[in-house]
Each structure stands twice: as structure tokens, then as C-alpha cells.
């Protein structure tokens, strides 16, 4: 799976991993031990209301994550407003990191199950997201990259709330977020970085967990987000229906 799409593309996603790793003040770091389900320590009940937030509270605001809006992708003015907000949230240095044109190279299209699987395998074959610390900034860079290179409307990247493993709400996206333990040595080595990833991702997460991307091929046929958090998916779909009715 993903072979045909790999033959069609040769370069664009090959640099994505390096662009994410070069995000300002952020390096790969070293992880301690194996990633386990819900293995890292939590700061407690921060963000308990994450899964129950209202439709109005699901705007993609700077400094927030896992709250990509559910909306009608056919509304052109809303797409443009969303794209402008995304661009406003990314500074000039991010533009250099993304390294793509301002306008998408192909017509805009919504993420589909098949497209999500193809993109997941393509990114994996080109170096992947495996083990890269998650942060709100890298979330936006990935959104922008796929929008500009593949024309994918950036309303698809959303994950279940914590604590523990965060499963993608887009069925077919094979990259989940897993809590990891960061070694003391890694923290010592990167202390001189103003915003090293183990610190930034921790504060991006309302549960205070350090998260990293992990490829999981079983997500192609098991909709874990819905199986484990049906109320979150239903709330998101309700917001989507509301926006369709208002539009």
C-alpha cells in the first residue's frame, strides 16, 4: 500500500522530516525506554474539558492543538479565512521551514480515507514522523505542507483528548501520538535551547505529557478514535452539521 503514490512523487515529502526537526529551537532528542500505552506521568486533570468543548471553542487558535475545526470544506470564504489564520500563526521562519509556495500547487481537496492512507505510507517511506516530538507548531507545519504540496484542506488533523495515546480522528491517518519519557541526559544536553521539543510539547498538551508521532498500520482497519471516544467523534460531527446548516 502506498507504492503507487510513492512512484508518482519523488522529492516533496522527503524533506518534511528535516523541516519538522529544524523547527526553531527544537531537536530530535533521545527517548528513554520503550513507548508504552499511557506510560508517562500526567500533571493531573488539566484540560478535562477538552472533549466537551463547544463548537464555538473549536477554532484553530495559536498555542492550542488537537482542535482543528470541523466545518464544511466547500465554503470557499471559510477556507480562505482558515488559511489566513494559519498563515498568521506561522512566522517568517516557519515559511522557510515549510519551503513551499504560498498557493497550493494542486486544486484544494478534502482528506479522504484512501488519501489519508496513501499520505501516511508516503510520509513513512520518506523518513516519516516516527519519534518526532509533537508540538502545536509542528502540527501547523504538517498542515501547511500537505495543503501546499497536495492541496489537502487543513481540517483533517485532529486527535482524541488525553491522557495517554491520542488517536487520529481522521480514519485512515496512520500516525498516532504516544506519551514518551524523556531521559535526564537529553534534557541536560538540550537545556541551552530556549524551546527544546520536550519542553514545548509538554506545555502544548493540557495533560502535561510529552508526545511523539508513531506509525500504526492497524489504524487502517480499526477506527480506534471512534471505538474508544465515541462521544468526541459525535460532538465533532454535531459541530460539522451545525456549520453546514448555518452555511
From Swiss-Prot:
GO terms for molecular function: GTP binding. Residues 31-54 are annotated as: Disordered. InterPro entries: HIV-1_Nef_core_sf, HIV_Nef. Its main location: host cell. One of its GO terms (cellular component) is membrane. It is found in: Host cell membrane. Keywords: Host cell membrane, Host membrane, Host-virus interaction, Lipoprotein, Membrane, Myristate, Viral immunoevasion, Virulence. It holds the Pfam family F-protein. It is a lipid-anchor. Belongs to the lentivirus primate group Nef protein family. This is a macaque isolate. Homodimer. Interacts with host CD247/TCRZ; this interaction induces down-regulation of cell surface TCR/CD3 complexes. This is Protein Nef. It comes from Simian immunodeficiency virus (isolate Mm251). The gene is nef.
Amino acid at each position: 500500500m502506498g507504492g503507487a503514490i510513492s512512484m508518482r512523487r519523488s522529492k516533496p515529502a522527503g524533506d518534511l522530516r528535516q523541516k519538522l526537526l529544524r523547527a526553531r529551537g527544537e531537536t530530535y532528542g533521545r527517548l528513554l525506554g520503550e513507548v508504552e500505552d499511557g506510560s508517562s506521568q500526567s500533571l493531573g486533570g488539566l484540560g478535562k474539558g477538552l472533549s466537551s468543548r463547544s463548537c464555538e471553542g473549536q477554532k484553530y487558535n495559536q498555542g492550542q492543538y488537537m482542535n482543528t475545526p470541523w466545518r464544511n470544506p466547500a465554503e470557499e470564504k471559510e477556507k480562505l479565512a482558515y488559511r489566513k489564520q494559519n498563515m498568521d500563526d506561522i512566522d517568517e521562519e516557519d515559511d522557510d521551514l515549510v519551503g513551499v509556495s504560498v498557493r497550493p500547487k494542486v486544486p484544494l481537496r478534502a482528506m479522504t480515507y484512501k488519501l489519508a492512507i496513501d499520505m501516511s505510507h508516503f510520509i513513512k517511506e520518506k523518513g516519516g514522523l516516527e519519534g518526532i516530538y509533537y508540538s502545536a507548531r509542528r502540527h501547523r507545519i504538517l498542515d501547511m505542507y500537505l495543503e501546499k504540496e497536495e492541496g489537502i484542506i487543513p481540517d483533517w488533523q485532529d486527535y482524541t483528548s488525553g491522557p495517554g495515546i491520542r488517536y487520529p480522528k481522521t480514519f485512515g491517518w496512520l500516525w498516532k501520538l504516544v506519551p514518551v519519557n524523556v531521559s535526564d541526559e537529553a534534557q541536560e544536553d538540550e537545556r541551552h535551547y530556549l524551546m527544546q521539543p520536550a519542553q514545548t510539547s509538554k506545555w502544548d498538551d493540557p495533560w502535561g505529557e510529552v508526545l511523539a508521532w508513531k506509525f500504526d498500520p492497524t489504524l487502517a482497519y480499526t477506527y480506534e478514535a471512534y471505538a474508544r471516544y465515541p462521544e468526541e467523534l459525535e460532538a465533532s460531527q454535531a459541530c460539522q452539521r451545525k456549520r453546514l446548516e448555518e452555511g
